[in-house]
Every structure is written in C-alpha cells, then in structure tokens.
Amino acid sequence: MISNRRSAFALSAAIATLCFAAPATAAKFDGNWNMVLVTTNGHCGVIKMGMAVNGGHISATSGKFAMHKLALAGLISGSGATKINGVAGPRQAVGTGRFTRVKGSGKWTGTGPSGVCAGVWTALRTSTI
C-alpha cells in the first residue's frame, strides 16, 4: 500500500514538473535586457527601457515615456521570433522582431495623442536568470 502511494506521488510530481516547466527553447532568452526604440517616422524620439524575459515571457523592468511608466507584454518563441505590446499612459505600440541569445532587433509602430509613430528597436542582453 505504501509502495503504491509513493509511486502515485512520484508520478504526480513528474507530471507536474513536465506540465509547469518552461520550454527549454524559450528559456534560452531568459534574463535582463536593455532595449532602445528609435523613431524613424513621427515625433516619439528615442525611448530607453529595461526588460526581463522569463520562460519566454517579456515584461518591462524600467523606463518612462512622456512621464508615464512603460509596460510591456510579449512572448519570444523558441526560434527567437517575437511580438511585443507596449503601453505608456494613453500611448500604445506593437513591435515585432527576432532575438538571439545576446541581442534582438525589430520594428515597431505606435499611436497616441500626438499621432502615429514608427521605428526600429534593438535589445542587448545584460544578464541571465
């Protein structure tokens, strides 16, 4: 009886580990990154921010635009492809691009009270988790 309980517990623990572990392919991008957005169309200027990647999920760690805290949400696939959504007060932006283990780059577009902006972004990894 005890042996069956131990086996059931071990099986449950193994299943939970498999179900909740981050995919290894997305985890290779985990860490802290510095990101810079440069405007090529519009009046949004240069935006610098910190971001974190955990299990392929992107979030902002620092940065402001027009006195509003920046918020990011996005995913990096196992191949490095990404789509990122950003918000700063009434302003919203969407970016796409690609990451490697040490850098990333892509394009973005945004809208806000002053109109439409677009540009390019780059990111450099500063540490791993």
Regions found by a protein language model. Name each.
Residues 10-19:
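Bacterial N-terminal signal peptides
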